[in-house]
Amino acid sequence: MLTARSKDLFTQAQEFIPGGVNSPVRAFKSVGADPLFIKKAFGCTITDADNNSYIDYVGSWGPMILGHCHPQVVEAVKRAVESGSSFGAPTELEITLARMVIDAVPSIEMVRMVSSGTEATMSAIRLARGYTGRDKIIKFSGCYHGHADALLVKAGSGAATFGVPDSPGVPVDVAKNTLTAQFNDLDSVSKLIDENKNEIACIIVEPIAGNMGTVPPGEGFLEGLRSICDSEGIVLIFDEVMTGFRVAYGGAQELYGVTPDMTTLGKIIGGGLPVGAFGGKKDIMKLLSPSGGVYQAGTLSGNPLAMTAGIETLKLLQADGFYEQLEQTSRRLAEGITEAAKSAGYPIYPTRVGSMFCTFFTSNEVKDWPTATTCDTKAFAAFFRMMLEKGIYLAPSQFETAFVSIAHTEVEIEKTIVAARSCFAAL
């Protein structure tokens, strides 16, 4: 495909925007290509600046579960903007969306709207610290919870005692309060708690890890975290920014039957507009200002356009058979890609939960960050580029989740599988 216009725009962008993009993964660095600049999208397709169209499995990194430009959402937002785009004051729309979220998500009794997933997770952690009077937190290697300083930490040789900053600009004094365990490893969690008795405010986890590819929780893992937190007086936070309303209407906590103390949300609840939320038990949430002393605020929190898009999106998700249809489509795609690799004799380890999926370029089981890193990232990059040439837009990183939307039909799924057969055979 010809992408001269995208290349020209990328050159221009690098003069004015660091790295030419406003979020690092968009630069396509890990797949050895220049990024596509997108000018429009509809349904399950996106169109770049050179008028090439692609079947989209990124979906703006998860929000577009309905597909792009769903007419009902678009019309609702058009009506809303005619009344004003931002007020900095309470609206009835906030109450409506809050009620819908509370009705859907088992753990949420009260909810605070914010403007991003990062804002939601950092605020939830602050609130957990205020609630418990403790400073340290536990996260999991390979789980991403936004770019707040306390969360840009990974495991190192000394991580059982102190966190190690994962980015320049993160003070060691901030990072030392973030302890890192291994996903799907309860023993690593128990060890950290034993070494930091009565100091852990919260454990934050993606119930389905979606930022090291797609890695489901092992049997008993989430239940074990719930039990540990109950016995140690620790707040359990599920980061459902990605999984919320994606793997089930009530999120991963509905799917797996494990209820955390707090939940963070984003992506889908804004219908494609910037949004985030965090909620949980009333006795925790009531500590949030102005009803309590834990401070959190935001100029655009509860933005009426985002609330409108979220309300309309959640209404559509309640349609009879919505998640069953999404599951059927997603299963067909994942099975087809797996069969394509098998037919070509190419080793992969496929994972999927609902409409989240990943094709790991390894023959090994992937259950955590160390096993995810055994993947052949160069082979994935080659596969990505070949698929892109065939009009298939996958997540431009081995360690990102891909998404299916309700707008994907049998036609797009079959075209994707045919392309995968050809590309695996060419590797």
Swiss-Prot record:
GO terms of molecular function: glutamate-1-semialdehyde 2,1-aminomutase activity; pyridoxal phosphate binding; transaminase activity
Keyword line: Cytoplasm, Isomerase, Porphyrin biosynthesis, Pyridoxal phosphate
A GO CC annotation given for this chain: cytoplasm
Cofactor(s) the protein requires to work: pyridoxal 5'-phosphate
Pathway(s) it belongs to: Porphyrin-containing compound metabolism; protoporphyrin-IX biosynthesis; 5-aminolevulinate from L-glutamyl-tRNA(Glu): step 2/2
Subcellular location: Cytoplasm
Residues with N6-(pyridoxal phosphate)lysine modification: 267
Keyword Amino-acid biosynthesis in annotation: no
Alphabetized PROSITE patterns for the sequence: AA_TRANSFER_CLASS_3 (PS00600)
Enzyme category, top tier: isomerase
BP-aspect Gene Ontology terms: protoporphyrinogen IX biosynthetic process
Known EC number: 5.4.3.8
Keyword Magnesium: no
Catalyzed chemical reaction(s): (S)-4-amino-5-oxopentanoate = 5-aminolevulinate
UniProt xrefs under HAMAP family: HemL_aminotrans_3 (MF_00375)
Entry similarity comment: Belongs to the class-III pyridoxal-phosphate-dependent aminotransferase family. HemL subfamily.
SUBUNIT field: Homodimer.
Name the record gives this protein: Glutamate-1-semialdehyde 2,1-aminomutase
Organism from which the protein derives: Geobacter sulfurreducens (strain ATCC 51573 / DSM 12127 / PCA)
